[in-house]
Amino acid sequence: MITKEFLQYTGFCAPIISSLGCAIMLVLFRHTHAKSEEGTLHRLLVSYFLLVSLGWICSLVYVYLPLLYVRINILYYLIVFWSQVVFYQFIYTLTRLPGEKPFSRIHYIFPLVIVGTFAVWSAFVPFETQVYIVTSRGEVAPGYEAYSRFFTARLLLRGIWNIAYTALAWWRLLAYRRSISDYSANADRTSLAWVTLLLLISFSLVPPSLLSAIFSKKILIASLLLLIPQLLLVAQHAVVCYNM
């Protein structure tokens, strides 16, 4: 009989395995078949898959190794932001028209400011207090109420960040559709039906991220609700690899 604990552990491991598998396949494909002009796209995707795998490894550490998580939580916070930025840069590059300005690096700098601020704040919070916040699954530490709430709000912030960058990606795709008159004339780069599917899957990841606004972390981790974004991510990875 498949136990609940086994399903939870498998759910955490699934996006790690799928993202690492996709990264390896893209690297191998790049060395044997890819065109030189597609190099940037492949590098972005490999970076995205590696960030996703690292992010879910950090999530696994949060659940099973809380002491280690406290030491790497700044890294996890940065990965949460940057993975979505890299994904958007991939969409931006894929739909970039001749003469259009290159991707702005400000998208990477803004998360550094947020995470840097949190890192400085964390430096003034005792290690034991941070461990308590993690092991209690989101309980407010006495005397550190604001920090506790910010520390445990990452799923919610991740959902908001996802909404913002998925909306930007949709805007890019719609603008691209308006700018070209014949998709078939650019078939090498755009059979964009799959990009639409990719964005739909990405947008479907938003509601699970916002579950933390409804349920406590104790309930989320103890339930199977996290299987939803985990399985959707595996589907997203399959769509990308199949079409690249």
Where in this protein do the model-derived segments appear?
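Helix-loop junctions on the outward
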Residues: K35, L54-Y76, P208-A222
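Hydrophobic transmembrane alpha-helical segments in integral membrane proteins
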Residues: M1-G21, L155-G159
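The cytoplasmic-loop to transmembrane-helix boundary for the fourth helix
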Residues: T95-E128, V134-T135, A146-L155, A185-S202
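Membrane-embedded alpha-helical segments of multi-pass membrane proteins
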Residues: P15-G21, L75-V86, L157, I228-Q236
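Membrane-interface segments at the starts/ends of alpha-helical transmembrane spans
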Residues: I2-E5, L68-I72, R137-L155, I219-L225
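Internal transmembrane alpha-helix with an interfacial aromatic "cap," most often the third helix
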Residues: A23-F29, F81-I106
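Hydrophobic alpha-helical transmembrane segments of multi-pass membrane proteins
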Residues: P15-M25, R43-V63, S83, V113-W121, ...
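Alpha-helical transmembrane segments of multi-pass integral membrane proteins
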Residues: K35-L54, Y108, S148-S212, S223-L232
